Design a protein with these regions (language model features):
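Catalytic or ion-translocation cores adjacent to nucleophile or general acid/base/metal-coordination motifs
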Residues: 1-19, 203-209, 303-320
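Acidic, low-complexity intrinsically disordered tails
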Residues: 405-448
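Glycine- and acidic
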Residues: 2-3, 52-59, 130-142, 164-174, ...
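Catalytic alpha/beta core of large soluble enzyme barrels
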Residues: 110-115, 155, 159-160, 259-264, ...
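Conserved phosphate/anionic-ligand binding catalytic regions in large, soluble enzymes, centered on
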Residues: 1, 73-128, 175-191, 278-308, ...
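Internal maturation/activation junctions in enzymes
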Residues: 33-35, 147-170, 196-289, 363, ...
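Core structural elements
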Residues: 42-43, 152-158, 172-194
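Active-site cavity-forming subdomains of large catalytic enzyme subunits
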Residues: 1-128, 133-136, 140-141, 164-171, ...
Length: 448
């Protein structure tokens, strides 16, 4: 019984499988990658044409009903958390760098979607903006623009001073200069505004926010290109043609992107600027931020808290952590959510809204509480594909012996008690003191 403990499998799912699984009579053909390696290099209509040509010639090794293949993927996902479901065609169709290669897979956390080849190993430098801080107080949009522009410049600078473990990694990073700007504190930001995660108001806020981040990030990279020059493989890219991430967003039945709304910024003027040059081939990706968000004292990336109250162990010992969003709730207890008790379709909808504006992808976990069925999972992942997500991350299952509702109840009871006494949960209890990193501190939590 062999185990590959450091292998994290993902399913690189083409549109064709998602179509065929809807037909109980449709078959799925398995081909040898050694005989037909071109299938891994093709996507979209070209992939389907070659795939069906090989099927007609009988070149497959064996066949299974497409729905059986899909159910097998979902069963393994439910039992083990793997394989992560990622979508091959959507990732490649929206690839700004489709003129110089193909995306063969994501990174481990599924937010990075970059070309790879025998000559190049993809590298991406990541950073995350703390929305709970930046989007607070006066002039939040101006503060956001300042933060985004600074982050883009700094991430670009890392490319030139970085240590590269291989020449293939160095070649790739210097040729394409990809970066991945993301966020953390998203859920805390929503709670501070009094916005329910499971609401259309959330989608409206998310759309407006990520339009702004996308605009500011693209603008910053285009301005850097005028100052420092475009990345070497710019010519022929979607950027060079004035095609922006929002232009390639998947269209719904009405011919418009999901949750389409009037634009707030002058995208035509930006499009003309982008045609003249971009400093970076890719600029946005939402990483998990599991550790750095704890250090910053905010919620992880774009996620609903796994638990509102838990105990954490590190080099400093064991201590109780109460989710930082709790301190903003007041008496609006309905705003408090835990991931297992959120309708997962709201997670999909919110991710779809954000994905329109993002050139790479997002680390999007999904959560299966006790009683989740195969039909439920089919609906969730089919909807993720239909709404244009490029990737999903873990499917986290709930322990049969542990119900986190009690943790939420404990927090709410503490809040009610505090309110009754004319107070709120203290910052010391509701918010861990943010720690500043220092290269001179060998025990810094971010390095563990």
């Amino acid at each position: 019984r062999l185990r590959a403990h450091d292998v994290f499998p993902a399913a690189w799912v083409p549109d064709l499988l998602m179509k065929r699984k809807e037909d109980p009579e449709a078959m799925w053909s398995f081909f040898s990658p050694h005989k037909f390696p071109e299938l891994h290099e093709l996507y979209g209509e070209e992939f389907e044409a070659r795939y069906e040509e090989l099927e007609a010639l009988g070149e497959f090794e064996f066949q299974l009903p497409a729905i059986k293949v899909w159910r097998h993927i979902l069963s393994n996902l439910f039992e083990t958390g793997h394989p992560w479901i990622t979508f091959k065609d959507e990732s490649n169709r929206r690839n700004p760098q489709s003129h110089v290669g193909v995306i063969h897979h994501s990174n481990l956390c599924t937010e990075i979607t970059l070309n790879t080849s025998k000559e190049e190993t993809a590298v991406c430098n990541l950073g995350s903006i703390n929305l709970a801080v930046v989007m607070s107080g006066d002039n939040p949009l101006e503060k956001l623009r300042t933060a985004v522009r600074l982050a883009i410049r700094n991430l670009d600078s890392v490319i030139d001073v970085n240590y590269y473990p291989s020449e293939r990694a160095k070649l790739s990073n210097l040729r394409h200069r990809p970066i991945g700007l993301g966020v953390m504190g998203y859920y805390e930001w929503l709670v501070k505004q009094g916005v329910d995660f499971e609401s259309d108001q959330h989608l409206e806020q998310a759309d407006a926010l990520f339009e702004a981040i996308s605009y500011f990030a693209i603008e910053a990279s285009a301005d850097l290109a005028q100052e420092l020059g475009s990345y070497p493989s710019f010519e022929g890219s979607k950027w060079s043609q004035g095609i922006l991430p929002i232009d390639t967003a998947k269209k719904m039945e009405d011919g418009k992107p999901f949750f389409d709304r009037p634009r707030r910024f002058d995208w035509e003027a930006l499009r003309e600027k982008v045609k003249k040059g971009m400093r970076n081939s890719n600029i946005m990706a939402i990483a998990p931020t599991a550790t750095i968000s704890n250090i910053a004292g905010t919620t992880q990336c774009t996620e609903v808290p796994f638990l509102l109250q838990f105990y954490k162990t590190n080099l400093g010992g064991v201590y109780k952590v109460i989710d930082p969003s709790v301190r903003h709730v007041g008496t609006n207890y309905h705003l408090l959510k835990e991931a297992f008790y959120v309708d997962q379709l709201w997670i999909i909808k919110a991710a779809a809204v954000r994905q329109k504006w993002i050139c790479q992808s997002q680390s999007t976990n999904l959560f299966a509480k006790q009683g989740t069925t195969g039909r439920d999972l089919d609906l969730i992942y089919t909807e993720a594909h239909r709404k244009g997500l490029k990737t999903t991350y873990y499917l986290r299952g709930q322990s049969a012996t542990k119900d986190s509702a009690s943790a939420k109840d404990d927090v709410i009871e503490a809040l009610k008690s505090a309110v009754a006494q004319g107070a709120t949960l203290s910052d010391a209890e509701a918010h861990q003191q943010a720690k500043l990193c220092s290269i001179f501190e060998p025990d810094c939590e971010s390095c563990q």
